[in-house]
UniProtKB/Swiss-Prot annotation:
Part of the 30S ribosomal subunit. Forms a tight heterodimer with protein bS6. Belongs to the bacterial ribosomal protein bS18 family. InterPro entries: Ribosomal_bS18 (IPR001648), Ribosomal_bS18_sf (IPR036870). HAMAP family: Ribosomal_bS18. Gene3D superfamilies: Ribosomal protein S18 (4.10.640.10). Pfam families: Ribosomal_S18 (PF01084). NCBIfam families: S18. This is Small ribosomal subunit protein bS18. Binds as a heterodimer with protein bS6 to the central domain of the 16S rRNA, where it helps stabilize the platform of the 30S subunit. GO terms for biological process: translation. Signal peptide: none annotated. SUPFAM superfamilies: Ribosomal protein S18.
Length: 82
């Protein structure tokens, strides 16, 4: 039991928050027409990547998800990437 707690404590210390990709590129407003940016937030299977994977804030994640859905409706992005 003690070993598990030590292992968990070590993992929590070494874990760093992910860098925000939108902030790094200087993007304030996510646009559905910017499909090159939106492709970074879609997995190879066509799923929208989670916040934990992308490092976005909750508000940015909602904006990206909405933009991806709009881009799919406008046929700028595929619904699946097979």
């Amino acid at each position: 039991m003690k070993r598990n707690n030590m292992k968990r404590a070590r993992m929590e210390q070494s874990r760093r928050p992910k860098k925000n990709p939108l902030k790094a590129e200087g993007i304030e407003q996510v646009d559905y027409k910017n499909y090159a940016l939106l492709r970074k937030f879609i997995s190879d299977r066509g799923k929208i990547r989670s916040r934990r994977v992308t490092g976005l804030t909750p508000q940015q994640q909602r904006e990206v998800a909405t933009a991806i859905k709009n881009a799919r409706e406008m046929a700028l992005l595929p619904f699946n990437s097979r």
